[in-house]
Regions:
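Gly-rich Lys/Arg/Thr-decorated short loops/hinges at beta-loop-alpha junctions or inter-strand turns
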Residues: 2-9, 163-168
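Internal alpha/beta scaffold segment
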Residues: 161-195
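Short, compositionally biased low-complexity segments
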Residues: 71-79, 155-164, 192-197
């Protein structure tokens, strides 16, 4: 099957699935794969034995329950991940899933960042404990409140777990939420222009 099978990856926004979506994914596993999929640490599900000729049918099926396979491979911004306890954690400043969704919508099919030097990973966390491992992502965002109660972010850059693992460095102690996307866009432009492509 190596010559005709492909891996299909589907992002799960913030790791949250409805029961309808879970049943839909189970149907894809049953009808197009070997009866199961693999949940990844990047909050995706992978099907590893998809026949290439069936890929259009799978994409159509995903769309029927509001899912897709956009930006799950290649040198682009990947699925934005969040704290697995987001929305329920006792120590969170605010639910980070809202911001993860905003970043996802901003980055999906962004024409300027469709061919980056390498795949690019963003994580967001809102708790005192960093359960999203933001220090090990290209951009790590930690939700914070200013002294006057304004929502913002501590921004970390340069983390990774690839062939040269490294811990991210703090780039900004506090960026107001209203400036988040323009700040991210600036980081992405620098990376796109100056990042290594070898």
């Amino acid at each position: 099957c190596k010559t005709v099978c492909i891996c299909s990856c589907t992002p799960i926004c913030c790791g949250v699935l409805s029961s309808h979506q879970m049943r839909g994914l189970a149907g894809i596993a049953r009808d197009f794969d070997r009866g199961f999929g693999h949940f990844t640490t990047r909050q995706n599900i992978q099907f590893n034995w998809i026949k290439l000729v069936e890929a259009p049918d799978i994409l159509d099926r995903l769309a029927s329950f509001d899912m897709h396979a956009i930006q799950t491979s290649g040198n682009c911004i990947r699925n934005v991940t969040s704290d697995p306890l987001a929305g329920a954690a006792h120590d969170e400043v605010q639910d980070p899933r809202i911001w993860a969704e905003i970043i996802r919508q901003w980055s999906t099919l962004h024409p300027e960042f469709a061919f980056l030097p390498r795949k690019f990973k963003i994580a967001i966390s809102a708790g005192a404990e960093d359960r999203a491992a933001t220090a090990f992502h290209d951009i790590g965002l930690r939700l914070a409140l200013s002294r006057n109660g304004e929502t913002g972010f501590r921004v970390f850059v340069g983390g990774g777990q690839g062939r040269t693992p490294r811990v991210a460095r703090k780039l900004a102690h506090f960026i107001p939420a209203r400036h988040l996307l323009s700040y991210l866009e600036s980081i992405m432009r620098v990376y796109n222009a100056a990042g290594r492509r070898d």
